[in-house]
């Protein structure tokens, strides 16, 4: 076995199937997941945790130590992968300007433990602690606290028998969720090691890898197919779950259930546009009014009219933006690009075409979301201009080679279409 993995959240069924097939031992399953796979709940400590990102369930986080990185890239070939350059629970020292590397540090402690990696450009610290997969130990008021997942009173009393003696010596102990699944002897030895490490300041090897994966629609659809092999699953299950959790559960009680009504309900008169960059950061583009839509069991197509106001020039096209200019753009669940046709507000003449290459767009309530693949194409006065290919190569550190190759393949396809006057 490669390691013990705990999986939580809306992707749990599909990921349990996938990581089981990759020789990981699945532990701490919910009763529902154990029953689906006709197994007993495996109450053992986890080496790695995979779960929904609490701020956006369109992303997953992976935490722990093990050789999972390559498998993550292979499982999520068409998604963005961010690995923290600083390990979770590692001990770092901020400089005088309250930074560490290129990241701002908050609060500005001279030394502290990383409790939030810098996925938003900021490291959050807490006071220095010795950390294992079972517990945290540090000097303080001599109290014991528990993970929110340890809520059984009998279990808390069991753990208190071990931590109370340390509390009386002035050590704080926080029990992590894994502690529920270890023996008293394992936990006792672990606490002894943590105290020694804390007093000797041995933090060099402390910390856990942290990955943030922004899931694409193609990878969600793959997870749909995996889940479908285990339990009744409609197409777009994992996408729809982000907006309609209970409604999807209700729909799937009917084996002939169709996602069309839920897909239609996601489309409002005006749609926002969430344009996600390779490092996982979102840019919100000017949204647009829906002027045409088509939804069926196989997918969806939405055409927007976006009003373009302000000064400046149109990106890639180079023509000045004038009052009343507008963009007509189609988002198609089958296409890895969107064609923006920019028109003059004065005489409705075509000013130019800009093609954004991205993963196929997904729908959330009143919002279109896609992963931007950096490389784009502009058509200016019949000239074809390939934009930001160097950015694609630079940002490839966040992508599987399959996604990089797909972006270049789509760009070449579009160039051929333009040259043959077959752009649709």
Curated annotation (Swiss-Prot):
Q: Establish whether keyword Repressor is in the entry.
A: no
Q: What is its EC number?
A: 3.1.26.-
Q: Does the keyword rRNA-binding apply?
A: no
Pfam families documented for this protein: DUF402
Q: What class of enzyme is it?
A: hydrolase
According to its UniProt entry, the protein's GO biological process terms are:
rRNA processing
| Keywords assigned by UniProt, alphabetized | Endonuclease, Hydrolase, Nuclease, RNA-binding, rRNA processing
Gene3D superfamilies, from UniProt? FomD-like
Q: Name one GO molecular function term.
A: mRNA 3'-UTR AU-rich region binding
Superkingdom in the source lineage: Archaea
The protein's matches in SUPFAM superfamilies, at most eight in alphabetical order, are given as:
FomD-like
The entry sums up its family as follows:
Belongs to the FAU-1 family.
General function of this protein: Probable RNase involved in rRNA stability through maturation and/or degradation of precursor rRNAs. Binds to RNA in loop regions with AU-rich sequences.
Question: What name goes with this protein?
Answer: Probable ribonuclease FAU-1
């Amino acid at each position: 076995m490669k390691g013990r993995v705990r999986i939580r959240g809306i992707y749990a069924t599909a990921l349990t199937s996938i990581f089981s097939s990759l020789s990981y031992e699945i532990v701490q399953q919910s009763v529902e997941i154990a029953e689906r796979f006709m197994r007993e709940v495996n109450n053992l400590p986890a080496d790695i945790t995979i779960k929904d990102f609490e701020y956006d369930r369109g992303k997953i986080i992976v935490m722990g130590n093990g050789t999972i990185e390559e498998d993550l890239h292979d499982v999520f070939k068409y998604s963005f992968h961010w690995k923290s350059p600083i390990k979770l629970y590692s001990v770092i020292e901020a400089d005088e300007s309250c930074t560490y590397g290129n990241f701002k540090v908050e609060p500005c402690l001279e030394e502290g433990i990383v409790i939030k990696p810098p996925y938003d450009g900021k490291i959050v610290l807490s006071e220095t602690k010795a950390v294992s997969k079972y517990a945290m130990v540090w000097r303080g008021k001599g109290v014991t606290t528990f993970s929110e997942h340890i809520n059984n009173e009998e279990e808390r009393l069991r753990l208190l028998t071990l931590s109370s003696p340390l509390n009386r010596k002035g050590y704080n102990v926080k029990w992590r969720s894994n502690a529920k699944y270890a023996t008293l002897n394992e936990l006792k030895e672990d606490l002894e090691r943590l105290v020694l490490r804390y007093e000797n300041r041995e933090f060099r090897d402390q910390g856990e890898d942290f990955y943030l994966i922004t899931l694409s629609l193609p990878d969600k659809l793959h997870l749909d197919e995996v889940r479908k092999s285990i339990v009744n699953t409609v197409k777009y299950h994992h996408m729809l779950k982000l907006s309609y959790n209970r409604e999807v559960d209700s729909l799937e009680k009917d084996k002939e259930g169709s996602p069309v009504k839920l897909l239609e309900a996601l489309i409002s008169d005006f749609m926002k546009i969430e344009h996600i960059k390779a490092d996982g950061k979102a840019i919100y583009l000017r949204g647009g009014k829906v002027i045409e839509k088509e939804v069926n069991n196989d997918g969806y197509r939405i055409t927007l009219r976006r009003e373009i106001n302000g000064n400046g020039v149109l990106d890639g096209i180079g023509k000045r933006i004038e009052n009343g200019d507008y963009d007509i753009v189609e988002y198609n669940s089958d296409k890895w690009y969107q064609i923006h046709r920019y028109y003059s507000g004065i005489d409705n003449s075509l000013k130019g075409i800009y093609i954004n290459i991205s993963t196929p767009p997904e729908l959330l309530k009143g919002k279109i979301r896609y992963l931007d693949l950096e490389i784009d194409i502009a058509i200016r006065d019949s000239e074809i201009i390939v934009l930001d290919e160097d950015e694609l190569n630079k940002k490839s550190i966040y992508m599987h080679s399959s996604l990089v190759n797909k972006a270049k393949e789509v760009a070449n396809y579009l160039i051929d279409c333009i040259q043959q006057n077959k752009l649709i």
